[in-house]
Curated annotation (Swiss-Prot):
This is Uncharacterized serine-rich protein C215.13. Glycans are attached at N31, N426. Residues 1-22 form the signal peptide. Transmembrane segments: none annotated. Its main location: endoplasmic reticulum. One of its GO terms (cellular component) is endoplasmic reticulum. It is found in: Endoplasmic reticulum; Cell membrane. Residues 70-145, 176-418 are annotated as: Disordered. Keywords: Cell membrane, Endoplasmic reticulum, Glycoprotein, GPI-anchor, Lipoprotein, Membrane, Signal. The keyword Lipid metabolism does not apply. It is a lipid-anchor; GPI-anchor. It comes from the Eukaryota.
Amino acid sequence: MGLRLLFSLICVFCISNIFTQAFLVHQIYGNSSFTKISLNQLEGRDSQEELQRRQEIRYYGRAAETGGTPTYYGYATPTSSSEPSIFSESATPSETNSYSSPVSSYSDPATSQLPSSTSFFSPTSSEYTPSSTESSSLLDPSSVSSAILPSSTSVEVSISSSSLSSSDPLTSSTFSSLSSSTSSSQPSVSSTSSSTFSSAAPTSTSSSYLSSSSVVSSSSSPSSSSSSTLTSSSLSTSSIPSTSSSSSSTSSSLSSSSSSSTASSSSSSSSIISSSSSSSSSPTSTSSTISSSSSSSSSPTSTSSTISSSSSSSSSFSSTLSSSSMSSSSSFSSSPTSSSSTISSSSSSPSSSSFSSTTSSSKSSSSFSSTVSSSSSTSSSTLTSSSSSSSRPASSSSHSSSLSSHKSSSSSKSSSAPVSSAFYHNSTSSRSSSHSSSHSLSSLSSKPILTASSSSLLTSSSHTYERSTVYVVTVETVSSGSSTYASQSTQTSILLVIVGDSSSTDSSGASSTHSKTSIFFSLFVVLAAAIVII
């Protein structure tokens, strides 16, 4: 019997591996058109001639191959400009043409990779040609219960905001979006949420640079009498050189949270408003953000509201990308009533020959993620917002937005296991890679005295080769906090392969689209073995 069981397990394991590999090979090389793709092309190492041909097509349209009149596929009609613009294409060193694109995104004719971004709420993505996007992810649990990570949810709150803007070719955009939340399983639960994001629009045809930095710290010290949390986040955007006048933009955001105690009847509300604006005669762009949190006590009613706004205006040929998003949540114990309100707004107003993209979104969470129990319970709201814009056809920006959700509830003795969910989809043009972070954080509540917080970080990276996208997801679970402040961490890795909708156009102009989705977990082997045994 033991030999049969062992043999069955080995067979199932081998078959599942073969099937997984066959599926991946089919997705990358399958369908007759894939057989023409060489290994060098799949790995992005094109020949010099291929790169030159693609550059000509990218800048001058398909007619560049035959020497005909350039045709601009998907691009706005070129307009002459006497002064440099961030959207300018220089045919000669002395002549400047400005391609002013409307707010909508256009795909590069060489790949026709349609801009797409999928998330629960409404992020916007525009993607053109090669560029890279990075998101930073930090996970730093404090002694009691504190998690810091991008667009994440812990016991109470989750917020994700990402924005990026790219103007010059070969410009890589980086953004970081951090959210921090803390939770205590005592009747008084305090939560914090903070997010920072910076965006800068390059304004010179010769040089462009986008930089963002953010810091979020959070701490929580629950005790029988009170629990308090304070979160502060700051960001600064780099100033960008311009050919006429100097322009610089800075933004900062500060967030703090209220605390409540376990005393018989107390309620607390917290409201944070963070905004920044800048304007100048030369190009400028600002982004500012957010933050919020609230906590409640043993008898009812906590409310939290947050308002984040960012505005930017400029008077001449400037690109402005302004986006802000935030989320607030409240938590409480017995007889809870929770009200969350979030407002996010962004505005930009350039005047002449310019490209402007603004995105704002707000969502309250009571309908999305809310858990109310007797004992101690928490509810949270989750909101993600992101925007990206790109100016030159040759440059591209891609963003990732992730929606996090959590469930937490506790009775006097029971604790719930971490539940994490992540929604991530990112499409980039052929031979461009995008690295992003998306994650969700689950929380748990335990005994009235013990404090526990669980967080899971899903870091996914995608590489797009022509028509297939492979995501490798690493799930890292960090649990921290107890009466003795002991901490432990567990890391688990799973293989998540998602081949999503993708579209491409070959050099002849024929386009093909296919959609397949498949998920293989290593758990499949165990389940299959169990089925065989049964």
